[in-house]
């Protein structure tokens, strides 16, 4: 009789654990990343150099399928230029400065099999890129996330990201 109680108890426990919802795993790519380097390859000499003299930026994957990216030229935040937001009468110098910053937000999907993350852009600093998709081949080298654009026009770029603390 005791063994029957143990068998029934074990069966109930096994059933209870099997009925729990499996939480989807959060991709390793999730989190806030700080740009360590953005390089461009000269295909004639096969030499890598800093893109636009050096870039800074952040990349956020929230674990719920949302992505945010902001890239900007080195020194962008220290230019000493001030202008009001949502105003169409800012100086030409400020307008030119804004073009040194690139950002978008959207949704993302990771294909582990292909090592590609797709960014579906919901908003963008460039109106012509609203609704477009960017694909990035990625891999990890230690604690560094390394990405290369799949699309031909940006395929000479390589971005290295470190997890922000």
PLM segments and residue spans:
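Lipid interaction determinants
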Residues: 19-165
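Bacterial Sec-dependent N-terminal signal peptides
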Residues: 1-29
